C-alpha cells in the first residue's frame, strides 16, 4: 500500500502535464515506476484508502486467460470493464473490423491464446508457458505477450499491461509484468491485483511455490479531472491493514480456469477500507 501511495504522491509533486491525444485531456505524468508484491507471504496489494472492487479485477484476468474478445463474456464473469471501450469508442465503432455490439477485437487474451502466425494458424502462448513450468522448464522466454502492432487496427484498445514474463528458480515461480501506460487513480488498483493474482494462480496450477511479482510501469499518470480527488481526498486518508487473498485449492489446471472456475473460487479476508471514490474514466 505504501508503494502505491508513494507513486500517487510522486505524480502529484513531480508530474509533468502532457496532452493526451486519444482522450483529449491533460495528464500529470511521471516516467518509470517499479512495484513489488510479496506473493510468497500473501501480502495482497489491495488499496485501502478507498474501496477497491478486487473481484472485477480478478474477473478481467480470468477473461484474458480464457482468450475472450467480447464485453458480454466479461460481464458474465463479473466485470463491466470492457463495456465502454467496446461500445463507446468512436474510432472502434467506425472500424470495419468491429463485428458488432460488445466486440473488442483482437486484444489482450486473444493475443495470449491465439497469436496469428504469418504462415497461418495460431500460437497459444499461455498453454506453452503452463506446460513448460509444469515440467519444471524455464527457457528464459516464458513470456505472455499481448503487444502485437501488426493487429492494433483490429482491436478497440492497445494493451496497457502488455507483457508477463515468468521465471523459475528451483521450485519458486517469479513474475515480471510490464505496463506501458497506467491511469493510476482508476487502473492501478486493478493492475496490482492482477499481477499478484496471476503469479499466485500460475504457481498453483503448475505446482510451484509463488515468489515475488515485479510490476514495471513506464508512463504513470493522473488525468486532470482526477487530480483534485487524488490530492485532496485519497492522499489525505490513512492506509489500513492489508487483507489476505485466497484461491480455491481445487483449481489445479489451465483447463479448470477455462471451464468451471468463477469468482466464488477467490476470496479476501480482513479487507478494511475507506469510502469509495468515483474517479472519472477516460475512454
From Swiss-Prot:
Keyword Phosphoprotein: no
Highest rank taxon of the organism: Bacteria
Enzyme Commission designation: 2.1.1.45
Pfam families the record matches: Thymidylat_synt
Class of the enzyme per the UniProt entry, highest EC level: transferase
Chain residues that bind (6R)-5,10-methylene-5,6,7,8-tetrahydrofolate: 183, 282
Residues annotated as catalytic: 160
UniProt keyword annotation of Zinc present: no
Enzymatic reactions: dUMP + (6R)-5,10-methylene-5,6,7,8-tetrahydrofolate = 7,8-dihydrofolate + dTMP
Alphabetical UniProt keywords: Cytoplasm, Methyltransferase, Nucleotide biosynthesis, Transferase
BP GO annotations: dTMP biosynthetic process; dTTP biosynthetic process; methylation
Recorded metabolic or biological pathway in which this protein acts: Pyrimidine metabolism; dTTP biosynthesis
GO molecular function, one term: thymidylate synthase activity
Protein location: Cytoplasm
InterPro entries associated with the record: Thymidate_synth/dCMP_Mease, Thymidate_synth/dCMP_Mease_dom, Thymidate_synth/dCMP_Mease_sf, Thymidylate_synthase, Thymidylate_synthase_AS
Residues reported to bind dUMP: 22, 180-183, 191, 221-223
One CC-aspect GO term: cytosol
UniProt family annotation: Belongs to the thymidylate synthase family. Bacterial-type ThyA subfamily.
Subunit-level organization: Homodimer.
Job of this protein: Catalyzes the reductive methylation of 2'-deoxyuridine-5'-monophosphate (dUMP) to 2'-deoxythymidine-5'-monophosphate (dTMP) while utilizing 5,10-methylenetetrahydrofolate (mTHF) as the methyl donor and reductant in the reaction, yielding dihydrofolate (DHF) as a by-product. This enzymatic reaction provides an intracellular de novo source of dTMP, an essential precursor for DNA biosynthesis.
Protein name: Thymidylate synthase
Amino acid at each position: 500500500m505504501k508503494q502505491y501511495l508513494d507513486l500517487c504522491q510522486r505524480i502529484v509533486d513531480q508530474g509533468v502535464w502532457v496532452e493526451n491525444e486519444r482522450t483529449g485531456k491533460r495528464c500529470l505524468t511521471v516516467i518509470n515506476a517499479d512495484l513489488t508484491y510479496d506473493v510468497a507471504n500473501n501480502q495482497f496489494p489491495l488499496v485501502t484508502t478507498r474501496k477497491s472492487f478486487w473481484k472485477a479485477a480478478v474477473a478481467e484476468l480470468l477473461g484474458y486467460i480464457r482468450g475472450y474478445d467480447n464485453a458480454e463474456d466479461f460481464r458474465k464473469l463479473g466485470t463491466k470493464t470492457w463495456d465502454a471501450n467496446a461500445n463507446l469508442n468512436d474510432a472502434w465503432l467506425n472500424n470495419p473490423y468491429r463485428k458488432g455490439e460488445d466486440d473488442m477485437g483482437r486484444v489482450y487474451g486473444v493475443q495470449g491464446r491465439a497469436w496469428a502466425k504469418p504462415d497461418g494458424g495460431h500460437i497459444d502462448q499461455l498453454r506453452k508457458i503452463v506446460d513448460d513450468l509444469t515440467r519444471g522448464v524455464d527457457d528464459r522466454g516464458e513470456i505472455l505477450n499481448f503487444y502485437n502492432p501488426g493487429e492494433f487496427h483490429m482491436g478497440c484498445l492497445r494493451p496497457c499491461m502488455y507483457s508477463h514474463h515468468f521465471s523459475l528458480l528451483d521450485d519458486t515461480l517469479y513474475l515480471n509484468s510490464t505496463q506501458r501506460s497506467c491511469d493510476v487513480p482508476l487502473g492501478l488498483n486493478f493492475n496490482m491485483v492482477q499481477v499478484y493474482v496471476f503469479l499466485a494462480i500460475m504457481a498453483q496450477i503448475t505446482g510451484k511455490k509463488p515468489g515475488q511479482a515485479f510490476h514495471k510501469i513506464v508512463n504513470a499518470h493522473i488525468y486532470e479531472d482526477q487530480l483534485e480527488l487524488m490530492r485532496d481526498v485519497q492522499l489525505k486518508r490513512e492506509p489500513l491493514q492489508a487483507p489476505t487473498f485466497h484461491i480455491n485449492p481445487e483449481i489445479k489446471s489451465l483447463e479448470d480456469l477455462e471451464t468451471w472456475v468463477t469468482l466464488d473460487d477467490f476470496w479476501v479476508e480482513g479487507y478494511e477500507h475507506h469510502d469509495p471514490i468515483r474517479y472519472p474514466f477516460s475512454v
